[in-house]
Amino acid sequence: MTSRTDVAQMIDHTLLKPEATPDQVAALAKEAGELGTYSICVSPNQLPVDVPSGVHVATVVGFPSGAVKTEVKAAETGRAVKDGAEEIDMVVNLSQVKSHDYAAVEADIKAVRDAAPAPVIVKVIIESAALDDEEIVATCQAAERAGADFVKTSTGFHPAGGASVHAVKLMAETVEGRLGVKASGGIRDAEAAQAMIDAGATRLGLSSSAAVLEGFEA
């Protein structure tokens, strides 16, 4: 089993409820420092946010539907970077994915990549539970062509569901280590987290980080 410290450094400690208050975000940041998580992930309206030393700041773009114009995603990304975001978790345009217009999917992602140049990290949320296997593979390939750093399973808000071991494994096999793979949505205990890691996840999006980490040995 992966060590607690190693798992903590894979976690984006997440609070994306629209009703989250600044006090709750501050508490999230404090807890991230105590738990030793890699980052916090909060909504862009909460930026800038103070975090303990060693904790990174991630935010979301086009969230949760992805159904906004590409230029809006790019503008949202630029503002988030200006406000201190070190990592951007963007949602693909699912209509384009379902239409199998992968050139458009790639262009949408590339616009965000261009608005968040390295060293900012760009993660692409593909909403894997809403896709078939061919769509998962093709969307991951589009993300790689567009210059993304990670592919990510889910927003956690889609009715189709969150991360699955099958999707994570397929995503990891597709990107073959060239991109990271983030599993998020419905991971609430150590057993589920370890299953995602074993399937190939290199980052975990968790709102229940403390409960998950309790199940790992130090």
Swiss-Prot record:
This is Deoxyribose-phosphate aldolase. Belongs to the DeoC/FbaB aldolase family. DeoC type 1 subfamily. It is found in: Cytoplasm. Its EC number is 4.1.2.4. It holds the Pfam family DeoC. Keywords: Cytoplasm, Lyase, Schiff base. The active site is at D89 (proton donor/acceptor), K152 (schiff-base intermediate with acetaldehyde), K182 (proton donor/acceptor). NCBIfam families: deoC (TIGR00126). It catalyses: 2-deoxy-D-ribose 5-phosphate = D-glyceraldehyde 3-phosphate + acetaldehyde. InterPro entries: Aldolase_TIM, DeoC, DeoC/FbaB/LacD_aldolase, DeoC_typeI. GO terms for cellular component: cytoplasm. GO terms for molecular function: deoxyribose-phosphate aldolase activity. Catalyzes a reversible aldol reaction between acetaldehyde and D-glyceraldehyde 3-phosphate to generate 2-deoxy-D-ribose 5-phosphate. GO terms for biological process: 2-deoxyribose 1-phosphate catabolic process; carbohydrate catabolic process; deoxyribonucleotide catabolic process. Pathway: Carbohydrate degradation; 2-deoxy-D-ribose 1-phosphate degradation; D-glyceraldehyde 3-phosphate and acetaldehyde from 2-deoxy-alpha-D-ribose 1-phosphate: step 2/2. CDD domains: DeoC (cd00959). The gene is deoC.
